[in-house]
Amino acid sequence: CGMDAVNDGYTQHIAEFVAENYSVAVLLVNYHCIQNRHKLGSKIYFDNIDLAILTQTCQTLNINLPAKLNPQLNQNIEEQEFEELITHLNSKLESLRNEWKFDVSKKLTFTYSIQPTKNEYQNFGLMQALDILNALCFVRKNYAEFKLAKTPKTLLFGYSHGAYLALLCAKFAPWLIDGIVESSAYVTVPLSYIGFGKEIDYEKYGDLFNELAKTIFVGYSKSLWTSNKNSPHFFSPAHNRIRNILDEKHLQIYASHHKAKITSYHCINDTQCAPVSQKEAFHNALKKLGFDNTLHIATQKDIDGKFIKNVNGHGMDMSIKMLIQKELPPLLAQEFKHEKDEKREISYPS
């Protein structure tokens, strides 16, 4: 599922439904940094950039922050304390506007950081895909315990970030993956989700945008990555490239291995989070390389209120359960051939 949609209860329900209705083993992977949203247990804190933005803005506008509302560097903040801080800032800004000391049409932007559960951080993609692949390898090695065929089919279903991870798994270990059904995957690395977007433009690149009456709070996942070329954690072009699904040379190398059947659904109006133009370019490239691939671009006529609920933008509020009901049976009926001497290693240029 996507980063905003991951929910233990929901995914468990889907897994149980699939296991009960189809002859499959369902694998849910608690991969690295899977819980980096507030409703899933993540915490709010202010790093040095967040504090600098907050402090400098308040000083410029002569807004006094009471000691109990003043965040401490890298210290978790309870949700109630965060809401009190927001309320205080909105109240002060309203007063300034009433006194015509501030542009009444402008909303001020502040930032905050998101601490995932288990004290993890956003590595983005690579470690998460490796967690999934390690879990797959474990199940395949112990196939008898899971009542599977000796060479079981491996099918990946994903939504948004989960869809991206499904495609990344196939890039890293094509011999393991037979089929992918995904909705709304991004195929390039979104700067907003790497964690250091605030270093570049804190009003533009962020995980979460909370637009309130007088302020906009932009949340960023905790990350070690930085745009600083002198840092050992610099997010270099090579780090970007290995995570990029659309890289032309990498796709050519992938195509020389076992090719997964790839079925995608995407919203015609998804222009920011996962631009539909990039998904079209991806599928055009796959077709030229001999993949069995299909891209469904949802438009207004596809809205049925059940499977696809809207085409306003990213995700379409698609029913994952109905996606599985639609796409899983034909995949289970299909035979996937593997060469006896197929390569089980892959290397990509940086």
Give the label of every model feature segment.
Residues 1-94:
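Short, surface-exposed "cap/lid" segments of acyl-processing enzymes
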Residues 2, 160, 268-269:
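Residue-level signal for short, function-critical loop segments
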Residues 15-22, 144, 169-176, 255-256, ...:
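Short, surface-exposed basic-aromatic patches at helix termini and helix-loop junctions that form
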Residues 27-29, 155, 181-183, 263-265:
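Hydrophobic/aromatic beta-strand patches that form the interior of the parallel beta-sheet core
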Residues 46-88, 115-130, 137-155, 176:
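Gly/Ser-rich "nucleophile elbow"/oxyanion-hole loop immediately N-terminal to the catalytic nucleophile
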Residues 86-115:
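Long, low-complexity, polar/charged, intrinsically disordered or flexibly structured peripheral segments
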Residues 137-199:
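Primarily recognizes the serine-hydrolase "nucleophile elbow" in alpha/beta-hydrolase
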Residues 205-350:
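Serine-hydrolase catalytic core
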